[in-house]
Amino acid sequence: MAIVEVVKYDGNPDVLVWKYPSQELGTWTQLIVNESQEAVLYKGGKIFDVFQSGRHTLETANIPLLNKVINLPFGGRSPFTAEVWFVNKLYSLDVKWGTPTPIQIQDPKYGVFVPVRANGRFGIQIEDSEKFLIKLVGSVSVFDRQSLVKHFRGLYITKAKDTISSYVVHKQVSPLEINAYLDEMSIFLKEKMEPVM
């Protein structure tokens, strides 16, 4: 298999994490990390280094831990295997969510049950690439916004249903008048959801 000369990712901005397909690298391989990205180098199942934006040569002087695991028989130029993961650090504001089925809420004024749906959008930004890879992505080679929404769907739907029902009951808001309270309700929902997300 050929040794990769340049490693970079210029793909879809909806992709949060992307694993470079080849693991055949060399101490002369150029790693190009765009402004809104970080690149994480894995060797032997462990994180070796995290690279910020810029052009990096994967040489042992730049990555001291490589000295311990690769043999340098060719005058400091040696092939080695490692994984490179690109993490999108861009702030994404357009992640949509919604309840797949209506929430049955009892109207406090009339005593009847009214079906209510909730939907909206939220923003995400990966703050800690290492933690995100280890705790959420695992070994999935592509993790996009849709994967994130699927991962948290059960959690945020349950919390949203709970919070909306609680708001309506405690504030004695009729579901028929709910549109007049959307701003206040959105703030209440955001406060309850932030610790979970």
Task: Label the model's feature ranges.
Residues 1-197:
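N-terminal hydrophobic membrane-entry segments
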